[in-house]
Amino acid sequence: MMPHQLSLVVGLGNPGSKYDGTRHNIGFMALERLARREGFSFRQQAKLHGLSADKGFGDQRLRLLMPQTFMNDSGRSVRAALDWYGFQPEEIVLLVDDMDLPLGRLRLRAQGSAGGHNGLRSTIQHLGTQVFPRLRIGIGAPAENPAERRARTVSHVLGPFSRAEQPCVDAVLDAVLDGLDRLKTQGMERAGTWINGFRYESPSAT
């Protein structure tokens, strides 16, 4: 069992209060939950184009980053952080929303394409590589209607979770934190097995 060298966790989203709690910002939500649990304090870092926080864990130091560049330019902030701290792409993990995954599911990958995600696309462009870990957080897809697909997609990802969905969202965010703990201590393969097998089950279904 080989632990993973995790130096930087990046949550992707859009800055500004009007985007708080939206599906596209679930990466921010996960990072904020991690910060609350571990006692991190974010501060604006102009040189990183984002909000950052760091804290020591034994002889290691973990850093968090929320780009404030808007989703489509997230890679500029990620690139700046890697250059400033001297990290390699393999030492980071991006937390991103995934419309192709149903709400209640997660997927960890060590590398891969953007898969239509603009934040991942920007990061790949700025880093010049697809080889960096990403944890995709399912947000579900809007009801299918080909004639209105684009409009429905935009309103879906920029819309809030419903009250009925909130218990699932809370459980998923807790699972993301659990998955990050496993990634640090158990390594990519074992953590991936647990993360990719996670499924939210409603208490009413048990």
Curated annotation (Swiss-Prot):
Signal peptide: none annotated. It catalyses: an N-acyl-L-alpha-aminoacyl-tRNA + H2O = an N-acyl-L-amino acid + a tRNA + H(+). Hydrolyzes ribosome-free peptidyl-tRNAs (with 1 or more amino acids incorporated), which drop off the ribosome during protein synthesis, or as a result of ribosome stalling. It is an enzyme of class 3 (hydrolase). TRNA binds at Y19, F70, N72, N118. HAMAP family: Pept_tRNA_hydro_bact (MF_00083). Its EC number is 3.1.1.29. PANTHER family: PEPTIDYL-TRNA HYDROLASE (PTHR17224:SF1). This is Peptidyl-tRNA hydrolase. GO terms for molecular function: peptidyl-tRNA hydrolase activity; tRNA binding. One of its GO terms (cellular component) is cytoplasm. The active site is at H24. Monomer. The record marks D97 as: Stabilizes the basic form of H active site to accept a proton. NCBIfam families: pth. Keywords: Cytoplasm, Hydrolase, RNA-binding, tRNA-binding. It is found in: Cytoplasm. Belongs to the PTH family. One of its GO terms (biological process) is protein quality control for misfolded or incompletely synthesized proteins. Its main location: cytoplasm.
